């Protein structure tokens, strides 16, 4: 494009922030979700992280990624507050997140995990034996989220609430392995491009979960 490195970084920051802010503004007009200052701060932190790495390292040693593991929701009946109607978490999930995989990949916060994938090789001394493609990733997720602030909703004029004892909202923290696809360096130019594009998705690999319920869970693939 003819832009200098600094101008390219600055332009990328502006475009990235504007693109991400669109979603936050749309949420701000929703009574169910509302504008989120932490979400906006996370957007700015992500863009800034990219810019700082590019400025100081001319490389992305820490990559932000996402994964989404499909969730099967309970079809057990939930009785309305008036006791005159029933629903289920399966029905609620269809309303909130959509019924097909692609909708749920984008919308289902219970299925999503957000990762910071660290390329260990790039932080060690030159000539180290750590595989250049093998990363350590830390992740953050949540469970039993069926509303913006609480698990209460309306359906055909009836009010429902998911029992917080049975379906507690809680946070999940992960540490696990990941693959930095561009570091594999395939010879095929087309494959190089594909690896670069899909590197925003974490590769399923063994991971350890620690959650705010006080549980430690090992996942063979996460």
Where do the PLM segments sit?
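Hydrophobic alpha-helical membrane segments
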Residues: 1-222
């Amino acid at each position: 494009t003819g832009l200098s490195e600094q101008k390219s970084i600055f332009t990328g920051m502006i475009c990235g922030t504007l693109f991400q802010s669109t979603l936050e503004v749309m949420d701000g007009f929703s009574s169910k979700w509302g504008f989120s200052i932490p979400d906006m701060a996370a957007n700015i932190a992500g863009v800034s992280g990219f810019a700082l790495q590019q400025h100081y390292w001319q490389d992305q040693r820490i990559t932000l990624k996402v994964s989404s593991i499909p969730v099967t929701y309970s079809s057990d009946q939930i009785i309305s507050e008036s006791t005159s109607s029933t629903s289920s978490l399966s029905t609620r999930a269809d309303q909130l997140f959509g019924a097909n995989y692609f909708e749920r990949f984008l919308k289902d916060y219970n299925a999503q995990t957000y990762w910071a994938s660290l390329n260990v090789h790039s932080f060690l001394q030159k000539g180290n034996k750590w595989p250049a493609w093998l990363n350590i990733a830390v992740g953050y997720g949540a469970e039993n989220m069926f509303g913006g602030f609480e698990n209460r909703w309306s359906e055909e004029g009836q009010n429902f609430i998911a029992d917080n004892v049975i379906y507690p909202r809680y946070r999940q923290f992960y540490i696990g392995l990941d693959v930095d696809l561009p570091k594999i360096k395939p010879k095929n130019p087309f494959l190089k491009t594909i690896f670069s594009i899909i590197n925003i998705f974490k590769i399923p690999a063994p991971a350890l979960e620690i959650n705010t319920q006080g549980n430690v869970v090992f996942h063979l693939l996460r």
